[in-house]
A protein has these predicted regions:
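Short glycine/proline- and aromatic-enriched beta-strand/turn motifs that initiate or cap beta-hairpins
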Residues: 20-68, 180-188
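Outer-membrane beta-barrel domain signature
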Residues: 29, 47-54, 70, 91-97, ...
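Residues that define the transmembrane beta-barrel architecture of outer-membrane proteins
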Residues: 34-38, 53-59, 98-104, 119, ...
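Transmembrane beta-strand segments that form the barrel wall of outer-membrane beta-barrel proteins
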Residues: 38-50, 81-83, 125-127, 163-176
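Gram-negative outer-membrane beta-barrel domains
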Residues: 110-120, 130-188
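Gram-negative (and chloroplast) outer-membrane scaffold detector with strong preference
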Residues: 46, 57-136, 187
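Short loop/turn motifs that connect adjacent beta-strands in outer-membrane beta-barrel proteins
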Residues: 25-35, 51, 68-75, 113-121, ...
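Bacterial Sec-dependent N-terminal signal peptides
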Residues: 1-27
Length: 188
């Protein structure tokens, strides 16, 4: 056997043994009663005033803990925080405006227990409070405002765990972000 083939064979044996070590101790069980997860991601947010057609970058973080078994899944409770920004230039009138949203809230979700190792799918509702700094830039007669508003929505998401503690996560919905992707960490 030549040296290159030996190196490839040793690497393959190492990779297989590493994957068996990562998954040792049974199947990946993403969410169960008593588990804690933390999500952090980036996405597309929207402003909450005006026509709702504007999108901008957003940062979102959330945590959840498994509370109750319900059928093949688990009900979780947790919290979330989102920061989003939107800016628009109305070229016809040469007028700029911008929104900066901070949303803090509680969330509840139902995590369905598929028989696919590492997969977690869920849907839920957030409730909270939002703070919006709105500036009308150079529009004559407007100085902007900073309202506080109630916040509610709906979301659907999925996580896939590569190990017992780390995975990827994505959510869509009418939420503090319309879509986001990030990482998920399972603490317990």
């Amino acid at each position: 056997m030549n040296n290159k083939l030996k190196i490839i064979l040793l690497f393959a044996i190492y990779a297989v043994s590493l994957s068996r070590t990562t998954y040792a101790g049974g199947p990946l069980d993403p969410v169960r009663v008593g588990s804690w997860t933390i999500n952090a991601g980036v996405g597309v947010g929207a402003h909450y005033f005006g026509n709702g057609a504007g999108f901008g970058p957003a940062l979102k973080g959330s945590f959840e803990t498994g509370m109750w078994d319900l059928g093949p899944g688990v009900i979780t409770l947790g919290g979330e925080a989102t920061f989003s920004f939107f800016s628009h230039n109305y070229g016809v009138d040469n007028w700029n405006e911008s929104w900066f949203n901070v949303i803090l809230g509680a969330r509840a979700a139902y995590h369905y227990g598929w028989n696919v190792e590492g997969l977690d799918t869920y849907g839920g509702i957030p409730l909270g409070i939002g703070f919006c700094a709105h500036g009308n830039g150079d529009y004559p007669g407007n100085s902007g405002y900073t309202p506080v508003y109630p916040y509610a929505g709906i979301f659907f998401g999925a996580s896939y765990f590569f190990t017992k503690t780390i995975g990827i996560n994505g959510e869509v919905g009418y939420n503090s972000t319309h879509a986001n992707i990030g990482v998920v960490f399972k603490l317990k």
